[in-house]
Every structure is written in structure tokens, then in C-alpha cells.
Amino acid sequence: MAGNAKILYVGTAGSDDPTRAGFPFNFAIGALEAGHQPEIFLAGEAAYLMLDVVMGAVQPVAMPALKDMVDTVVARSVPLYV
């Protein structure tokens, strides 16, 4: 893909599946590193991930902690829709 793409990542998994819950954030960070403009939309159970107590407890497999990934996308001004 040439150029700068705008990509929407949709998350529906909640804390019961921490690895799937982390995918939108992990993918958005990868898109940022590749020079694209990611956005994240959280629906259903994924909306609960934005609660501080839940966010701090979610540790996806083979990814940084959810809180660290959320902090990264927020610091990089990635739009986050809940």
C-alpha cells in the first residue's frame, strides 16, 4: 500500500479475552510506526476496557500491557471511539 492510509480498528473483545482485547491497540501502534493514521472503535464488551481498574488488569499474550498500549495511542493522538 503506497502512501498514508487511514485505518479503523474495531475491538469487541473484553477482559475475558485479553489477547483479542489488545489487538486494536497493538495494530494501531504498528500502523503509526508504518506512517498511517489509525483510529480505534470499541464496541460491546470492549468498552469496559476503558475503565481504569479493567485496563490496569489486562495483560495480552506477547504484547505490552493494555494500559501501556492505551497510553501510547493516546499520547500519539489516535482517535478512540467508545
What would you call each of these model-derived segments?
Residues 21-34, 40:
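Histidine-anchored nucleotide/phosphate-binding helix
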Residues 38-43, 80-82:
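Short internal beta-strands
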Residues 14-16, 45-48:
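Short, catalytically relevant binding-site loops at active-site mouths
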Residues 46-60:
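N-terminal beta-loop-helix "entrance" segment that forms/cooperates
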Residues 1-4:
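Basic/polar N-terminal segments that are highly enriched at the extreme N-terminus
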Residues 7-22, 53-54:
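Short, glycine-rich nucleotide/cofactor-binding loops
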Residues 56-82:
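A glycine-rich helix N-cap at a beta->alpha junction
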